Structure formats: structure tokens, C-alpha cells
Amino acid sequence: MQSIKTLILINIFIGLFLPLSQVFASNLDEVICSAMNGMVEQESKKIPFSAGEFSVVGISVDCEKKILTTEKKHIDYKKEDFKLNFQENYQKNWKKSNCSNMIFNTNTGWSTVQLVKGKEGFLVAKVRADFSKCSE
């Protein structure tokens, strides 16, 4: 009889805990998504805007895929004007500037991607910060 009570207690615990953890994860995703959407809405009003040698030309969030994407174009450089190691160096900088954010440095599933293009609009680099990149 004692073992049956123990099994029932374990089943109740598992039955309650698993859905509850899914609810917490779901609520966290909803909070992050809402915050990202609000930020995108505000920043979109400013686009295009200058950011040093670049112009920010796009920002979006995909809550289903959990990705915040920004896009910028260099004001002067064409694709061939960028150094060969630009992708590698820019990835290091992107990681450094975004991995202090708990949304990306913990296992939330969220990532931030930036597309860097030359002045003609050709892709030069695609950089990402997420839990796996921030854990390297």
C-alpha cells in the first residue's frame, strides 16, 4: 500500500511539475517576445538611421523562431572593400556586445542576428549571438 501511495505521489508531482515548467517557459517567451516587439516598433520609427560608418536599414523580430534581426549597410564600402577577416572580427564584436544580455547568454532559445551589407546591398557578413555562441 505504501508503494502505491508513493507512485501516486510521484505521478501527481510529475503531472503538475512538467506542465508548470512549460507554462513558465511559455510565459518567459511571451514576455521576451512582447519586449522585442515593443523595441522593434520604437526603433522602426527611426529607420534608416546612422550608426557610425553604417546606416541601420532594418529591424525585425520573429517570435516563433525566437530571432531578433537587424540589418545595416555600410555608407561608403562596397562588398569588395571589406577586409577578408571582417566576418570573423565582426562576429567577435557582436558576441562581445550581446553576450552580456541574459536573453542571449542563457538557454532561452533566443538569438540576435545582424546582417551587414555593403553600400550596394550585397551581404558581407551575418553574425549571431545566442546561448551556444555566448558559451564558447
What are these model-predicted stretches?
Residues L18, F82-N89, G118-V124:
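Short, intrinsically disordered, charge-biased short linear motifs at domain edges
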Residues I8-P19:
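Bacterial N-terminal signal peptides
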Residues D81-N105:
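Short, non-transmembrane amphipathic alpha-helical segments
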Residues G38-V40, N93:
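Short, non-transmembrane alpha-helical segments in secretory-pathway proteins
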Residues D29, E41-Q42, I47-Y77, F104-E136:
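Polar/charged, Gly/Pro-rich intrinsically disordered segments
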Residues L20-A25:
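Sec/Tat signal peptide C-region and signal peptidase I cleavage site
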